[in-house]
Amino acid sequence: MEYNFREIEKKWQKIWVDNHTYQVNEDASKQKFYVLNMFPYPSGAGLHVGHPLGYIASDIYARYKRLQGFNVLNPMGYDAYGLPAEQYAIQTGQHPAITTVNNINRYREQLDKIGFSFDWNREIRTCDPEYYHWTQWAFIKMFNSYYCNDEKQARPIEELIEAFSTNGTQGMNVACGEEMDFTADEWNAKSEKEQQEILMNYRIAYLGNTMVNWCPALGTVLANDEVVDGVSERGGYPVIQKVMRQWCLRVSAYAQRLLDGLETVEWTDSLKETQRNWIGRSEGAEMNFKVKDSDIEFTIFTTRADTVFGVTFMVLAPESELVAKLTTPEQKAEVDAYLDRTKKRTERERIADRSVSGVFSGSYAINPLTNEPIPVWISDYVLAGYGTGAIMAVPAHDSRDYAFAKHFNLEIRPLIEGCDVSEESFDAKEGIMMNSPRPGAPEGGLVLNGLTVKEAIAKTKEYIKATGLGRVKVNFRLRDAIFSRQRYWGEPFPVYYKDGMPYMIDESCLPLELPEVAKFLPTETGEPPLGHATKWAWDTVNKCVTDNENIDNRTIFPLELNTMPGFAGSSAYYLRYMDPRNHEALVSPAVDQYWKNVDLYVGGTEHATGHLIYSRFWNKFLHDWGISVAEEPFQKLVNQGMIQGRSNFVYRIKDTNTFVSLNLKDQYEVTPIHVDVNIVSNDILDLEAFKAWRPEYETAEFILEDGKYICGWAVEKMSKSMFNVVNPDMIVEKYGADTLRMYEMFLGPVEQSKPWDTNGIDGVHRFIKKFWSLFYDRNGEYLVKDEPATKEELKALHKLIKKVTGDIEQFSYNTSVSAFMICVNELSSLKCNKKEVLEQLIVVLAPFAPHVCEELWDTLGNTTSVCDAQWPTFNEQYLVEDTVNYTISFNGKARFNMEFPADAASDAIQATVLADERSLKWTEGKTPKKVIVVPKKIVNIVI
């Protein structure tokens, strides 16, 4: 019988659905294993061959764990809210819900063809009201919580209100936006609105004024990773920095726990380090600086308190509120012009860019230890969100301060004995202090001269604490997350506004569903798209949405017009997969207790400082409320690499429609243009197909070499815009899903990026055919016999079992595919058709090529799926070699090799080697001085 992959794959995909093969339920008798992929955003382009890489890798592992007897949860869903669907809706007028469903259906069709073991009964879509019910619920919980630093957890906001009513802020140690100081009487005397404004300083979900990346053309705030070179990643529209009142999440309150949690998870060292750097813990001191001729005082944070004697200027972030206060009238025009320029740069660009820019404010601060006046500058190398948004600049011992001082000709004052700062700053935290204070300074006060840097830091901290000039402080780079977007296609906030302050709708009224709007653009008055909704007001009496015309600001109030960002729906989706049809809770306690957290999470490294931070924060918050039993959501994380596209180029001669072949292009002034890889074969362009590809090329002319047009090529990201996308449907149709699955694994290690190249795919397809031929000959005769296997056959099998078991545990799937090929070749050479061997071979191959393995498993007479078989264990006795190959050396130089029985004695080996005629040749009749036998390795004859 011929291997007909199309019929086989279609047959078994239907059987899996009909038999609910991959449906899973909690089973206390089995150990659980939760496998999860970062779910996809369903774009209109569908999947290309790069997308399934991680899915295939995780699916192999999921199937493997099931064969080991684990109860495996392997769900899939869709991150369905997002900017692309909304942009498409703006361009076409088609509702995002329609395009999203169409895209999801296309994704599902493609995923099903590849044969994944997903439990589709647990499918979730973040745009489904039944799903975002629980996103809204979590937001309400965050709004009604504060973070207690003493207990290191979130607590109900009612407890904080009670504490304020009784003691004011006395004795409070809580996470907040700014330090506040008031008595119980002062609190109790405030109006409801005033109290609500104060509570906003403590809530975990709060409204705050933040600097954002604002894109006027898109009418929304963008995340840092959505902005490239000052323009939006999608559409290329200009982006500016702007202060806006936004919903935020107090992620910073969890900074230390996010840092500590990294010690408990199995992630790569590089990814952990990325998160550590993003969280950015630093121990230092806050110091207070007064402004000359003013009663204004401001605070700076420094990790080098020892360098305070070397401060020669101060720098404010352009966004700092101090800029307006400290800019003198003489400097205002220059400062305003500088601020206008910096608005066009994102924080990420400012961090990466080492060019120097700045402007003098006109004001001076006073060094609290020397009483010297210090000029206050403004520069975008200082960020408002880190520390206090103001720094003391010590150019002798900080490279960015040094570059600034050199550029603006400011004083550089070294503080370390023997350091040379003529060409660069001395940043090392080592050496002996000097100039602290400088010679001739008034006596008294802090003296650091002669101390080591470490001693000086400690002494300075003690001094400023004792004198009230500052305090010891641990600072974090991690910022609170901006949580609102001025878009339509996102989760609505369960928020209405009373007297300008936000209030939550009752949890019993969730979900608050996204309303219909006539337009997806901002309103004429600049409101977000939800401003177009005519039925978007909250009736607090009847607890329902009502028409806007009914708003009376007594019982009916306007609803929030912003929507939640893309990461809202992806921050706790792993929990919802556990219990997706529960209408009473995000996840029931019993189900949560069983599945706990994700054992294996697979996704890209690009989410290291976004999704993976937000999910960990979200989970820790829910853990505080007793919702998630595990504090960390993802125990083991594997980052799959990227399958890159192999792009092709044609070269158009400037100002013509003539295209010159690759090796002739240097003779002309040309422009390289991406060309569709589907009309190129082995870098040779199909000329007629190229002319038909796009209207502007219909009259194209060509300068050929040897009658052919040779295209250029490059390995790049697989993308529609580069015309290098390979559709997996084409591969499945031509070779089958099992071939695609194995070939993607064969391309290289899962974690590494590698170019897509179909040159080796025929070899993988031939392997599956050869595997099939162990069961059927060319005439369709069934070959399998129920006879005892030979030692050689069992050796080939058990060598494979050992290799593949180890490889799967290490995600070394590429070497597993090689091992399968070697084993099948060996069994073919041995003409092995023994059921004892082939049955176990099927089980080991099944995670990689499930369709063909199900078919052959069935032919062996099994009545259940191969998924429910048992993973075989290798037997070491079959792996012991009968003979050992020895290298025979003379005076340390290898001359030839000899085979000996594995249990041969050294004396017997020596005698046999010396008697060999080749030894007689190399000894030239001389008696050896010494013969050294290294067991199982080498025989060295010393002459």
Curated annotation (Swiss-Prot):
<dbReference type="InterPro" id="IPR001412">
    <property type="entry name" value="aa-tRNA-synth_I_CS"/>
</dbReference>
<dbReference type="InterPro" id="IPR009080">
    <property type="entry name" value="tRNAsynth_Ia_anticodon-bd"/>
</dbReference>
<feature type="binding site">
    <location>
        <position position="720"/>
    </location>
    <ligand>
        <name>ATP</name>
    </ligand>
</feature>
<dbReference type="InterPro" id="IPR002302">
    <property type="entry name" value="Leu-tRNA-ligase"/>
</dbReference>
<dbReference type="GO" id="GO:0005524">
    <property type="term" value="F:ATP binding"/>
</dbReference>
<dbReference type="InterPro" id="IPR015413">
    <property type="entry name" value="Methionyl/Leucyl_tRNA_Synth"/>
</dbReference>
<comment type="similarity">
    <text>Belongs to the class-I aminoacyl-tRNA synthetase family.</text>
</comment>
<dbReference type="InterPro" id="IPR025709">
    <property type="entry name" value="Leu_tRNA-synth_edit"/>
</dbReference>
<keyword id="KW-0963">Cytoplasm</keyword>
<feature type="short sequence motif" description="'HIGH' region">
    <location>
        <begin position="40"/>
        <end position="51"/>
    </location>
</feature>
<dbReference type="GO" id="GO:0002161">
    <property type="term" value="F:aminoacyl-tRNA deacylase activity"/>
</dbReference>
<protein>
    <recommendedName>
        <fullName>Leucine--tRNA ligase</fullName>
        <ecNumber>6.1.1.4</ecNumber>
    </recommendedName>
</protein>
<dbReference type="InterPro" id="IPR009008">
    <property type="entry name" value="Val/Leu/Ile-tRNA-synth_edit"/>
</dbReference>
<dbReference type="GO" id="GO:0005829">
    <property type="term" value="C:cytosol"/>
</dbReference>
<keyword id="KW-0547">Nucleotide-binding</keyword>
<dbReference type="InterPro" id="IPR013155">
    <property type="entry name" value="M/V/L/I-tRNA-synth_anticd-bd"/>
</dbReference>
<feature type="short sequence motif" description="'KMSKS' region">
    <location>
        <begin position="717"/>
        <end position="721"/>
    </location>
</feature>
<dbReference type="Pfam" id="PF09334">
    <property type="entry name" value="tRNA-synt_1g"/>
</dbReference>
<keyword id="KW-0648">Protein biosynthesis</keyword>
<dbReference type="GO" id="GO:0004823">
    <property type="term" value="F:leucine-tRNA ligase activity"/>
</dbReference>
<keyword id="KW-0067">ATP-binding</keyword>
<dbReference type="GO" id="GO:0006429">
    <property type="term" value="P:leucyl-tRNA aminoacylation"/>
</dbReference>
<dbReference type="Pfam" id="PF13603">
    <property type="entry name" value="tRNA-synt_1_2"/>
</dbReference>
<dbReference type="InterPro" id="IPR014729">
    <property type="entry name" value="Rossmann-like_a/b/a_fold"/>
</dbReference>
<keyword id="KW-0030">Aminoacyl-tRNA synthetase</keyword>
<keyword id="KW-0436">Ligase</keyword>
<dbReference type="Pfam" id="PF08264">
    <property type="entry name" value="Anticodon_1"/>
</dbReference>
